[in-house]
């Protein structure tokens, strides 16, 4: 009897200690690898700034230089290094190709100093004037700056931020494809040919090329005219405009005062910081940085 009881107790203990079939299956079942969540794609922020690869796509053709110029289908983008915001640049506008009766190709139409600026939402292109000045060490300097506020030539949306976060991407099409008068046919000559407006459907960017110190833009402008110099049946004038923008050197050339005894081109500047206690127009010689080529 005792042996039978002992046998039953041992059997019961083994039943408790032995894993069930379900437990064995769970024990030897292959563990699934942990699920790795894919990073969510970056979304554009509240200012409409998109991820870089959503703007400058794999289809982009890039021309590296002063600004990297990206071409994506029919859109053109400037990628402006942060180090060049605030730097002064010279923009020279010429008529590269002209309609018969207007003049000759290559004639200069406008020259202006520009400065690119950026805030948190936009990029501004300003026209800089040095006609009125005062040394920044003088108390009157702030008053001179406030009375010589720089006009905004164009305002751009920020499309993206560069891959290394040290540059800003803007779309440049509208600067050259809309009627920005400072970069197109001069207002004085528009009156001569009775130009009423620019035809956007016949105006477009031809080429944009970037070099280490400058960017060369060529664009076609078509203007509606009631008195065109040639092909009057079209009622329009088409021109190819050239805009050359070059970075000005940080170290300026030494100025030379103008003297009427020497026949030389010159320009005036009103200086409010002289010791004469009044503003005075000072004339300086026009100088060109001519350097021997290696």
Give the ranges of each region predicted by the language model.
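Bacterial Sec-dependent N-terminal signal peptides
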Residues: 1-26
């Amino acid at each position: 009897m005792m042996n039978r009881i002992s046998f039953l107790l041992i059997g019961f203990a083994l039943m408790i200690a032995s894993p069930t079939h379900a437990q064995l299956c769970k024990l030897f079942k292959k563990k699934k690898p942990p699920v790795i969540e894919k990073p969510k794609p970056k979304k554009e922020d509240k200012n409409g700034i998109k991820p870089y690869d959503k703007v400058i796509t794999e289809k982009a053709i890039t021309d590296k230089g002063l600004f990297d110029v990206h071409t994506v289908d029919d859109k053109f983008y400037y990628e402006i290094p942060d180090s060049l915001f605030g730097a002064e640049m010279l923009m020279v506008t010429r008529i590269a190709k002209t309609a018969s009766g207007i003049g000759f190709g290559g004639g200069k139409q406008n020259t202006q100093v520009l400065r690119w600026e950026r805030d948190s939402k936009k990029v501004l292109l300003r026209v800089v004037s040095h006609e009125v000045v005062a040394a920044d060490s003088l108390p009157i300097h702030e008053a001179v700056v406030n009375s010589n506020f720089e006009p905004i030539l164009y305002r751009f949306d920020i499309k993206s931020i560069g891959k290394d976060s040290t540059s800003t991407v803007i779309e440049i099409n509208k600067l050259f494809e809309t009627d920005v008068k400072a970069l197109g046919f001069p207002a004085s000559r528009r009156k001569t040919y009775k130009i009423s407006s620019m035809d956007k459907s016949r105006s477009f960017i031809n080429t944009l090329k970037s070099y280490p110190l400058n960017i060369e833009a060529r664009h076609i402008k078509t203007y509606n005219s009631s008195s065109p110099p040639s092909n009057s049946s079209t009622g329009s004038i088409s021109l190819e405009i050239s805009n050359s923008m070059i970075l000005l050197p940080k170290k300026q050339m030494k100025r030379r005062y103008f003297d009427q005894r020497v026949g030389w081109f010159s320009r005036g500047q009103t200086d409010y910081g002289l010791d004469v206690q009044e503003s005075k127009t000072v004339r300086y010689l026009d100088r060109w940085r001519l350097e021997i080529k290696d």
